[in-house]
Amino acid sequence: MEPILAPNPNRFVIFPIQYHDIWNMYKKAEASFWTVEEVDISKDINDWNKLTPDEKYFIKHVLAFFAASDGIVNENLAERFCTEVQITEARCFYGFQMAIENIHSEMYSLLIDTYVKDSNEKNYLFNAIETMPCVKKKADWAQKWIHDSAGYGERLIAFAAVEGIFFSGSFASIFWLKKRGLMPGLTFSNELISRDEGLHCDFACLMFKHLLHPPSEETVRSIITDAVSIEQEFLTAALPVKLIGMNCEMMKTYIEFVADRLISELGFKKIYNVTNPFDFMENISLEGKTNFFEKRVGEYQKMGVMSQEDNHFSLDVDF
């Protein structure tokens, strides 16, 4: 049995820290905590009213996917990962991740509630898993992995793919709107959320490195390429990014680029060997490393939480 999954009678007490790298990730998550009340969406309505019908359609569907997906991630954490993983440091991270995912879901729901005035359309968007086939396909894939009999390692990769690949193109599409100077509330919340998801993805890679018997490279590649094809279809066929003026082929390449970054972080060879086609995404968290945090997006980092130099807390650790 994997040491991180083995019964641990000390799991109820935090100190002494046994896994300093995992604890450091938890402290980074804690330092980046934010709430929806800190995001000003009051100026978005003016921009929203100026968008084309295609642009509105695209944004509404992306928000609908996001609003549902965080709940799926949380269900996996509650039902599987939090009960399987026995080391305290990881349980701290997963517990905090659940709180953050709730904030993401509330943020997306608030954005839908603000932009969409028709109550029937709101219900349609809030129930996207049932009402939108393109969202249902992604949700079904993620939910399948919650209940899968595969080992923790395989399911860890699947949810790294959900947070690293299934969100990547949608994040990029909203950053594209930021490049155009539109929707400051939406784009700022997107910065915060993509930063959080970048850390969650990095945490999955760190947990993977703690496995003594990880899944094979072939298994990992299979899960990741499956996620890539679903995400490419989502943003080039089901909900094409050309609706907001983005290039579909470049989006396909970008999703492959993100997948390569993920599989490299896991310690395997790249699959696609492509370069990032979106210059505006060069400094965004999904490119990988959590050094994105050190930029303090919008100065959102809790004061003092990461300032201790002792107890192995360091911002210089390179995973």
From Swiss-Prot:
Cofactor(s) needed for function: Fe cation
Chain intervals for the UniProt region annotation (Interaction with R1): 313-319
Native source organism of the sequence: Vaccinia virus (strain Ankara) (VACV)
Gene Ontology molecular function, alphabetical: metal ion binding; ribonucleoside-diphosphate reductase activity, thioredoxin disulfide as acceptor
Role this protein plays: Ribonucleoside-diphosphate reductase holoenzyme provides the precursors necessary for viral DNA synthesis. Allows virus growth in non-dividing cells. Catalyzes the biosynthesis of deoxyribonucleotides from the corresponding ribonucleotides.
GO biological process terms, semicolon-separated: deoxyribonucleotide biosynthetic process
Name recorded for this polypeptide: Ribonucleoside-diphosphate reductase small chain
Top enzyme category: oxidoreductase
Residues at the catalytic site: 108
Pfam family, one: Ribonuc_red_sm
